[in-house]
């Protein structure tokens, strides 16, 4: 959302093609189309099942991607499309807009597929879905005008495992704002909690692909210390 607002403030006409919310909607029914803060939003209704199981996620992925495919001409009306790596088949559709309409393609890599699925033993290497993902990677990275990686480590992995050009891959950390300097300590809402303490913060995902053993080890080693605060949105 910050990216969308920044593009709008820079003078671009911005639209968002996204899924219709199932559990995050507040206040009841959400319109399928609306103009919010100068941004045209088109929400697509699709089959949404439970997200906890593998089969449910696959149904959600394919259903949403299919409905985006039906709106491919809408994507083609824009000069550029910014597409994220999740669901993993979605960038393939965006790459077709590049081929059919000449729409510039910006691919934002949150996750690397099929590696995420194979490392977590969700999929077997060489399976039909893995081969499909590898084909999608070839199409997307061949057609992308720009690729955004979340870290230098991810960029190095992309350059090592994908047919990507170094100059086209840019590192933009997530949830980062260049506000030009440090904030005033008096404006820190946690100033009383952190006063006189050395604070180490971890702001990141806590999932199957993260090294949680280090964090859990610190919790166990320092469990008697009254100096730890863990907050999360489980």
Task: Report the location of each language-model feature.
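A short helix/loop element that forms part of the nucleotide-sugar donor recognition site in Leloir-type
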Residues: 29-33, 177, 181-195, 199
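Membrane-proximal helix-turn-helix segments that form the acceptor-binding/catalytic region
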Residues: 89-92, 96-101, 127-147
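Conserved small/polar residues in nucleotide/adenosyl-binding loops
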Residues: 230-234
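Carbohydrate-associated surface elements
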Residues: 153, 175
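N-terminal subdomain of nucleotide-sugar transferases
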Residues: 1-37, 219-222
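Acceptor-binding helix/loop patch of EC 2.4 sugar-transfer enzymes
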Residues: 46-56, 101-135, 184
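Conserved donor-binding/catalytic core segment of Leloir-type glycosyltransferases
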Residues: 189-210, 216-219
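An aromatic- and histidine-rich active-site surface loop
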Residues: 61-67, 73, 78-116
């Amino acid at each position: 959302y910050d990216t969308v607002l920044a593009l709008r403030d820079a003078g671009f006409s911005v639209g968002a093609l996204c899924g219709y919310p199932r559990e995050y909607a507040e206040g009841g029914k959400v319109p399928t189309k609306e103009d919010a803060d100068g941004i045209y939003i088109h929400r697509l209704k699709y089959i949404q099942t439970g997200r906890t199981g593998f089969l449910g996620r696959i149904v959600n992925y394919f259903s949403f991607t299919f409905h985006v495919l039906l709106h491919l001409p809408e994507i083609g009306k824009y000069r550029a499309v910014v597409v994220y790596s999740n669901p993993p088949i979605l960038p393939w559709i965006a790459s077709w807009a590049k081929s059919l309409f000449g729409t510039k393609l910006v691919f934002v890599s949150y996750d690397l597929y099929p590696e995420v699925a194979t490392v977590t033993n969700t999929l077997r290497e060489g399976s039909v879905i893995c081969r499909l993902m590898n084909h999608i990677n070839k199409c997307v990275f061949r057609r992308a005008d720009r690729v955004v990686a979340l870290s230098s480590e991810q960029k190095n992995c992309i350059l090592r495992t994908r047919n990507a050009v170094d100059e086209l891959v840019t590192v933009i950390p997530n949830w980062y704002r260049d506000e030009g300097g440090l904030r005033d300590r008096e404006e820190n809402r946690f100033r009383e909690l952190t006063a006189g303490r050395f604070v180490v913060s971890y702001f990141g995902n806590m999932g199957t692909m993260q090294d949680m053993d280090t964090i859990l080890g610190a919790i166990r080693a320092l469990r008697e210390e009254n100096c730890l605060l863990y907050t999360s949105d489980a």
